Amino acid sequence: MDLNKKHLLYLIVFFLFINLNASGQSNSVSGKILNQSTKEPVRYASIALFKQDSVFLKGTTADSIGRFGFTNLISDDYVLSVSCMGFEAKKILLQNLSESAEVDVFLSESVLSLGEIVVSASSTISKINQRIVFPTKLQLSHSANGMQLLNTMMLPGLNINPMANTISSSDGGKVVLQINGVNATPEEVQTLQPRQIRRVEYSDYAGIRYGEASKIVNYIVTRDNRGGVIGVDLMNSLNILAGGDVFFAKFNKGKSEYALNYTTAFQKINSNNRTRTGSYRFGNSTPLHRDEIGDGGDYSYQMHDVTFGYNYQQSDSVFFNAKLKYALTNHPHNDFKSNLKENGIETGRIFDGVSQKINTPTIDLYYERGLKNQQKVYANVVGSFAKAETGRNYIEYDNADTLFSEQFGLVSDKYSLIAEGIYEKGFTDGSLKLGAKHIQSFTEQEIHQNGVFKSDLNQTESSVFAEWNHGKDNFSYSLGIRINRVHFSNSSVNKSYYNFLPKVMFGYQLSEKSFIRYDAEMSQTNPTLVELTDTEIRLDPYLAEKGNLSLKPYRNLNNNLFYENKKGLFTFNANLRHHYKHNPIMESIKEQSDFFLIMPENMKSWNRYNAEMTLKVGMIKNILQFSLTGGYNHFNSQGNNYSHSHSNFYYSANVLAMYKKWMFIGQIQPFDEKLYGETVTKSGNYHYLAIQYNANNFSFGIGAFNPFKNVSRTVIENKNYQAPFRRESFSSASQTIVATLTWNFSFGKTHGSGTKSIENQDTDYGVKGSYK
């Protein structure tokens, strides 16, 4: 797609979606939320407007000085409901509202949980960069945990995989989960009780402090000061040996909370299949064709994660959190067996087995303090150690001899320390954030392959950032800047790189139900430990790979134009995206004497153009809702000696039905396709059906993944001229029936604890899961 066509597409969609229809009602309700004791503004309180029959009409949050407002109201009776954590909820009856009214609401401080606000109809507040979703009574009663509740909301741009309990973004960016503003894991979200959740704040524009994250999902939960909860969240297969289970317990006493979470996942099958077809063209010779026909293989996996947490909260001004975590991932078998043909002639068999084990203890300390004049500071320090062990055994053999064999082993020890601090200041119509972050890591690797080779790498990354957010009337904008330094050093390299990384957002509220937003961001991607490991590994007789110590960090530029419009039961939104990488790290394949070497290099450029539309309908009669998404991708990959492009259309669909205590879920998710370097990767492609029964503190259900046909697989196609290949991986685990059970027991009064506003973790262990 050339530049003129791209600009034309942007303009057509921009003018097609602009809608300036706004109603002209003159009545309004506005005012301030104030602390009854201090008379100071209460920031970010939740305000909902109901009819007297409890039907939800509108909702908003107070700004940084406690202001709120509702416009375009007809003459009627209303109920104004105000709630904020740390205060008692208050409801005000507005009888016979026939003209605009100014209402100041005074809230009393309280250590008790908030009174329930029953929402019985549509309850989403759409802002330029955020959706605030108040869960309805129906959604709460049909959800067993925080993850299921999110699935009932069908938020645009989010893909929820109920099998893996993972959340991904349709634009490929990272999704950050939070509880009361703190980064959380999917397992922690699973432990949330629906009755705790007051609202979900979904931001599809993430500020510069969140790095490369594209979406933020923040659960706002209630707090008490005593009691506890214990519970389980189980999902296990009925036809294969596989499952994922969560066990949790929390105990609250005074200003302290103690929490213990244990998560385990496991899978064991003997139908791990891989089919690979490739050719090798050396010089001007006739290509050698090799076909590997899959013949099963063992796959086994275990994951154990134990987390002990303690936090202390003094009112809303001081919060301390300490977390001790130990994670073990054990992958003893990822084996493939194949029958081998060369130029159509059977030559033997292949065994390709990979094992991997990772141990990671972590300590995480966090401190937050609120200051006078709408100021707040945060500090976070994380220390971790990761020991990773990887082994590979590759053999080609016939009935009499071993034709080719290669053994490889790697032991990696990584020590890392992450420290971050943020200062925040609120103003009348905006806020300012200043922050600094430093990452220090040291890695030692020992490689066993025809001898023992040792290497080490020191890596540091330091950055400072500033961000200004402003909103007034119908216009909002955000300006941010990050200055970044990355340094690599070992016995053979000593390099530093500096980058200036801006981020901007401009949005305009076209009407009460529609808005348009544009944002642009420049970010940096660093080479991974695997890419920097300068050791050659033979994959088969004709193929090898190695890292590259001369790799440099590269920059990304993201542009996004977004439009949304709501009317009744219908919500429509559209995205135009462009993602550009300058000198990205992509693969190169070079001919050696008798084999080809795969090696990462900084290439010329990479582009992705994307157009996507989503239509959500519901709830219809408080029973049915569904959403449809369709889109188009175009990729262009420019290497130093190659040029490739790839295009694809895609779609997805979700349906949800709720009746009495029963819930039905249906999902269709097609292949996620991507061209990067010379390789097209297609992964995913599943459909899911489930039925669930919900009762107080208890639910069970039956679900089926790919019940009609096993369509899930991973397809990788390489387009290199001299050594192209096509690989397809699949197993019986992609077609399974699962049983789910959720149970929890509460005693006293429980609360979602005070929470952190920043969280850091180092997950680059310098190992790979497969090698061919």
Question: Across the structure, where does each feature detected by a protein language model lie?
Answer:
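Short, acidic Ser/Thr/Gly-rich low-complexity loop/linker segments typical of extracellular
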Residues: 52-67
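Transmembrane beta-strands of outer-membrane beta-barrel pores
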Residues: 234-238, 253, 264-268, 326-330, ...
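Outer-membrane beta-barrel signature, preferentially recognizing the C-terminal barrel domain
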Residues: 514, 524-573, 580, 598-609, ...
